[in-house]
Amino acid sequence: MLSRRIIPCLDVRNGRVVKGVKFHDHIDMGDIVELALRYRAQGADELVFYDIGASPEGRSVDYTWVERVARLIDIPFCVAGGIGDVETARAVLHAGADKISINSPALGRPQLISELADAFGVQCVVVGIDSIREDDGQWRVRRYTGDPSKTQALPMRTLDWVAEAQRLGAGEIVLNCMDNDGVRRGYDIAQLRQVRALCHVPLIASGGAGEMQHFADVFDQADVDGALAASVFHSGAIPIPELKQFLRAQQIEVRDGQ
């Protein structure tokens, strides 16, 4: 196993970083570039930026802030939001992103995954999956979660979509466990373990980090390749250098800070 990755997630709306709870009630957390520079200095392994309004609003990501981030940081970063075709993806990568992530557009047209993988290589193509547990006990996917008024429940089971996304060429899966998002009670280990059993590409856990032990738990118990978090990093509740020191003490291999 390679070193586990620590990945701050920055949800972007109207050019600012925001954060909600279970994808609702977003509040302003700060400037995109300022936060990106802070995380780079703290030793984040990479960054993920979600333009959360892009897909619900039927537009592509704003390239201007992608270019600003690319000029100032030297760690890998991934961009998501309204990337619905090869040309849009090319523009985002040309602006400086290392990877692109697709979610709602891929649910609407799964072949997009293959088109992007063919154009740029699977290493550039991340598929984000917003998943929630329904009353029958099954996890199913949601679309357009960046706007609660437009969020759609789909009949597709999360596990089936993970398998299909890999078949089509996804190079990495980010599983956003919506039930756990922003509540800081830990990652959804049960769901992540089921996904891990059939996921043969890097798997990133998202949703639920509240304390350092939660990161250790998700690495040890769900065998994920990376852990993504937002509110605990934005608020300063968990400083990344201290987190990495804690994980090393738990015999979990992480990269040294920058």
Curated annotation (Swiss-Prot):
The entry's keywords: Amino-acid biosynthesis, Cytoplasm, Histidine biosynthesis, Lyase
Chief location: cytoplasm
One GO term of the biological process aspect: L-histidine biosynthetic process
Cystine residue pairs: none
This protein's pathway: Amino-acid biosynthesis; L-histidine biosynthesis; L-histidine from 5-phospho-alpha-D-ribose 1-diphosphate: step 5/9
Active-site positions on this chain: D11, D130
Any one GO molecular function term: imidazoleglycerol-phosphate synthase activity
Coiled-coil segments: none
Keyword Phosphoprotein attached: no
UniProt keyword Cytoplasm present: yes
Compartments, as annotated in UniProt: Cytoplasm
Annotated catalysed reactions: 5-[(5-phospho-1-deoxy-D-ribulos-1-ylimino)methylamino]-1-(5-phospho-beta-D-ribosyl)imidazole-4-carboxamide + L-glutamine = D-erythro-1-(imidazol-4-yl)glycerol 3-phosphate + 5-amino-1-(5-phospho-beta-D-ribosyl)imidazole-4-carboxamide + L-glutamate + H(+)
EC number: 4.3.2.10
Superkingdom as given in the UniProt entry: Bacteria
GO CC list: cytoplasm
Any Pfam family matching the protein: His_biosynth
Subunit structure: Heterodimer of HisH and HisF.
Similarity section: Belongs to the HisA/HisF family.
Function per UniProt: IGPS catalyzes the conversion of PRFAR and glutamine to IGP, AICAR and glutamate. The HisF subunit catalyzes the cyclization activity that produces IGP and AICAR from PRFAR using the ammonia provided by the HisH subunit.
Stated name of the protein: Imidazole glycerol phosphate synthase subunit HisF
Organism: Xanthomonas oryzae pv. oryzae (strain KACC10331 / KXO85)
Source taxonomy: Bacteria, Pseudomonadati, Pseudomonadota, Gammaproteobacteria, Lysobacterales
Gene encoding the protein: hisF
